[in-house]
Amino acid sequence: MFEDSNAATDHFRSDLYSNSQIAERALNAVIVRADICRSFEEFLAIFDRFYAENIEATSDTGGEPVRGKDRVRSILLNFLIPLHVMAEIGGLSVGIREHAMPGDAAGETHSAWTLELAGTSGNTCTLSWRTFRKWNGADVIHEHHYDHKQIGGPLTSDDLSLSAVIPADGLRRA
């Protein structure tokens, strides 16, 4: 009887492990395929689909945990909207790559990310970090970013092609 119980528990753990790995691959694939130049809303739809209402987000850069989908969405928007505007209007080239990292705990996944930003000036900034996610079924319930690195300095307005944008004082009234 005890052996049957262990077999059932092992099967359950195996399912949890494989299900979280499948969900992780699906989430990461849609993030990589999404195009910030086209829309930031695509990323919000991904967030809404894969993250639990009670999501908790943390980072090794300090600060208190951010709890709740609305609060995390607000932080996400503060990142996505400027990035979208710089890509759509300023000509910023944005590329993102993901690399799965091995793990052995059911319901937990790790991945490494690289965000490459290239201005029209030719200057680049590459950000990399690692992500730990804890899953409950198909929903992320905890996400932690760690091991942040930056190669290259921050890009400035000189690195973007903003000359096509008409300044507000350059508009004439009819």
Where are the regions that the model predicts?
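A beta-strand edge to alpha-helix "cap/lid" segment located at domain peripheries
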Residues: 1-18, 80-174
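Hydrophobic alpha-helical core bundles mediating ligand binding, dimerization, or RNAP-core interactions
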Residues: 27-34, 40, 51, 75-80, ...
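A solvent-exposed, acidic/Ser-Thr-rich amphipathic alpha-helical stretch
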Residues: 42-109
